[in-house]
């Protein structure tokens, strides 16, 4: 690999990745973390299949006599679309849930329709007022932090909980795969309800009315009182994203949207323009590193791909400015300003850390995601520490 940077010997995470360390073999701590998760969950092995088979039986038992027995968040992307197919194959009765931040691409919207129609699955949608959604997004942009997708990610989680509560469903299935996508490094892309609300209060102009904000109390309600479990099937079973794409295209005339997270136009702006240009950060190394770890791509090819400019949708910047009512000068001024960290705004982070023992128990019981426990419930390393 042609670089003077220190790079993990197993993936392509380099010394610029937040809070990275390397062991005596040159393997980064994130590879070791994923190694531990694979062993714990039995991912793609008999152990994982047995564990997940028991979960399926528990889902069916808990859903007996109800219209639905599980919730699946859908975006029109590969993972959630394939998850819909799998749940029907497993004999489950899913309710698809979609949070519409009003930035969906036409391809994603059509993908959702095609798959749900073919599989005869009902859809529950929460649409935030587009002016309000744009006001929240614009406020995060003005805050100079990297998490402009935070409001969408948190809202989807809240909406899935609400749908589960409404229909008395005890299980939410999520299409995340740490084998195919990796896990976002510590300190990157943090979000919680207090963070979003505080930034919107500082920079927003409209009241937050239709946006489904997940506060700390609501988070505890969903996990401890409602006891809604979050299951990530791909953490247990074998999953190949490329095979899933081929299957979806063949069976449902599903269309690929051009890249990971590019099914939504605000997400596309975040990944291909905002992070690379303002923060000098490119999250493609998450997926590329996962491909290298899985032997689906060699390190040199992945490194070359990572160092190419990301694909940028034509007229995406102009669309972003028009939607958020930003002048050229205003947009340029924000993009050139010094970036800020989420640590400079109010969050629930200290509270999560204080309650770490509780969240460990909840994570083990699938009542909060294990990735939440690993990323949010430990103190950040001090300055100068890795």
What are these regions (language model features)?
Residues 82-83:
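Hydrophobic positions on the alpha1 helix immediately C-terminal to the Walker A/P-loop
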Residues 1-70, 86-386:
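Nucleotide-activated chemistry modules centered on ATP-dependent adenylation/adenylyltransferase
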Residues 70-79:
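Short, glycine-rich nucleotide/cofactor-binding loops
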């Amino acid at each position: 690999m042609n670089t003077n940077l220190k790079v993990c010997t197993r993936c392509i995470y380099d010394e610029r990745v937040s809070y990275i360390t390397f062991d005596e073999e040159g393997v980064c701590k994130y590879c070791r973390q994923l190694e531990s998760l694979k062993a714990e969950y039995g991912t793609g092995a008999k152990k994982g299949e047995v564990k997940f088979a028991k979960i399926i039986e528990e889902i069916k038992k808990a859903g007996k006599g109800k219209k639905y027995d599980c919730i699946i968040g859908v975006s029109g992307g590969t993972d959630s679309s394939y998850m819909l197919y799998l749940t029907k194959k497993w004999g489950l009765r899913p309710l698809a849930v979609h949070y519409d931040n009003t930035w969906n691409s036409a391809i994603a919207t059509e993908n959702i329709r095609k798959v749900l129609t073919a599989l005869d699955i009902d859809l529950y949608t929460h649409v935030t007022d587009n002016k309000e959604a744009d006001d929240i997004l614009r406020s995060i942009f003005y805050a100079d932090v990297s998490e402009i997708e935070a409001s969408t990610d948190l809202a989807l989680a809240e909406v899935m909980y609400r749908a589960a509560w409404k229909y008395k469903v005890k299980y939410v299935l999520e299409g995340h795969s740490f084998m195919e996508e990796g896990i976002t490094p510590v300190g990157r892309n943090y979000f919680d309800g207090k963070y979003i609300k505080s930034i919107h209060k500082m920079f927003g102009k409209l009241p937050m009315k239709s946006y489904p904000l997940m506060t700390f109390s609501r988070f505890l309600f969903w996990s401890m009182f409602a006891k809604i479990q979050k299951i990530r099937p791909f953490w247990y079973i074998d999953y190949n994203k490329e095979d899933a794409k081929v299957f979806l295209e063949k069976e449902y005339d599903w269309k690929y949207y051009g890249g990971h997270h590019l099914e939504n136009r605000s997400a596309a702006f975040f990944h291909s323009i905002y992070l690379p240009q303002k923060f000098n950060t490119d999250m493609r190394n998450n997926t590329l590193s996962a491909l290298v770890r899985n032997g689906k791509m060699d390190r040199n090819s992945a490194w070359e791909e990572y160092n190419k400019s990301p694909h940028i949708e034509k007229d995406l910047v102009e669309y972003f400015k028009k939607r958020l009512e930003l002048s050229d000068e205003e947009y340029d001024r924000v993009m050139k300003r010094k970036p800020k960290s989420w640590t400079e705004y109010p969050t629930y982070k200290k509270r999560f850390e204080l309650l770490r023992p509780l969240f460990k128990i909840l994570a083990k019981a699938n009542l909060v995601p294990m990735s939440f426990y690993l990323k949010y419930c430990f103190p950040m390393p001090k300055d100068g520490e890795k």
